[in-house]
Amino acid sequence: MTAIRYEFIKTCKQTGARLGRVHTPHGSFDTPTFMPVGTLATVKTMSPEELKAMDSGIILSNTYHLWLRPGHEIVREAGGLHKFMNWDRAILTDSGGFQVFSLSDFRRIEEEGVHFRNHLNGDKLFLSPEKAMEIQNALGSDIMMAFDECPPFPATFEYMKKSVERTSRWAERCLKAHERPQDQGLFGIVQGGEFEELRRQSAKDLVSMDFPGYAVGGLSVGEPKDIMNRVLEFTTPLLPDNKPRYLMGVGSPDSLIDGAIRGIDMFDCVLPTRIARNGTCMTSEGRLVVKNAKFARDFGPLDPNCDCYTCKNYSRAYIRHLMKCDETFGIRLTSYHNLHFLLNLMEQVRQAIREDRLGDFREEFFEQYGFNKPNAKNF
C-alpha cells in the first residue's frame, strides 16, 4: 500500500481540467488545490488553526531551511514535523534543490551532489539525493520531493540535456535511499526547460520509475506565461492519469486557473504571503495596494465580495494604518486575506469543473480581475 493515493473524480468537459482527491497518512484534500508555504515550519504570521479555518488541507515546508535551522534531527526528536508545528493535516516538503541553486552565490554541481555555501553564514555544505532523503525521512512529511537540478532560464539545449539526464539519475538514487515509502510518498520532478524533446525524455525516465506522484519543475523561473502554458500543454499528457500532478512555485490567480485547465492538481507559492507583507492584496476586482493614500479614509473591506475573517472585521483604512506603522497585525490581516482568496479561488475552480464550465469561469474571472486589459498588472 503506497502512502499517497490519487482518486480521480471527473474531467471538465469544457476544458479537460480534472477534479480529484489526494489521500495521505494525514487526511485527504480535494484537487486542484493551492498549498500555502510554511518555509520554516510556519506559514508566516499564521497559526495552524487559522489555516484550518480557511480549509487548507495541505501545506508545504522547506527541507533546506529546516536542515539549517533547527536541524532535521531536532525535528525527528520532536516526533516529526507534524508534531513539531502542531499541524495534523498533510505536509509536502520540497527537496532543497531550488534553494541550493537560487540562494547560494557559490555552488559546484558534481555527479554525487552539489557543493554550496550556507546563505546564512557562508559555511560550506553538500547536498546529495541521499542527504535530501535522509532529511525528509526525518521530517516525516506526507509527500517528499526527489532532489533535482534546477537549471536557470534561459538555458541551452545542451546544458538542459545534461541536467535532465543527471536529474533522472538522482531520482533513481532518491528512490533507493527513501527509507519510509509506506508512510511517505516520494514525487519525481520532470525537468527539461522549454524543450519538448527533453520534457518527453524526463517524463519517460521518471514514469518508468513508478513514483506515486509527479511534479513539473523548472517553470515560474522568469519565463513568459505563454511559454509556461505551452510547456504544460505538452508535459502533463506525458504523466499518468492515476497519479497527482504538481506545478511547483506557481501562485498568481491567472496561473492557477490556466494550470488547472492544463491538467495540474497541486500548486504552491510564497506569493500570497510575500506580497501581503508589503500591503498588496488579491481581491475579486484585481490587485489592491492597501498602503496607497487613497485608502486612508476608506472604511470598507479589502474585498467587498470576500467573507474571510479580515474582510468581515477590518477596514482598508485600519489595515493601511497598521501597515504604515509597521504593525505586525497588519501583515497578519493581509496574509490571512490573500491565503483565503487563493484557497477560495481553488474551490471556485473545483466547482466550475463539477459544472463543466471552467472555460467560462476563466473568462469571467480574467475580465473582472483585469487580466484581459492590455497592460494588466500582475504580481
Swiss-Prot record:
InterPro entries assigned to the protein according to its UniProt record, in alphabetical order: ArchSynthase1/Queuine_TRR, TGT, TGT-like_sf, tRNA_ribo_trans-like
GO terms assigned for molecular function: metal ion binding; tRNA-guanosine(34) queuine transglycosylase activity
GO biological process: queuosine biosynthetic process; tRNA wobble guanine modification; tRNA-guanine transglycosylation
Region: RNA binding, residue numbers: 249-255, 273-277
Catalysed reactions, semicolon-separated: 7-aminomethyl-7-carbaguanine + guanosine(34) in tRNA = 7-aminomethyl-7-carbaguanosine(34) in tRNA + guanine
Subunit (UniProt): Homodimer. Within each dimer, one monomer is responsible for RNA recognition and catalysis, while the other monomer binds to the replacement base PreQ1.
Family to which the UniProt record says this protein belongs: Belongs to the queuine tRNA-ribosyltransferase family.
Protein name, UniProt field: Queuine tRNA-ribosyltransferase
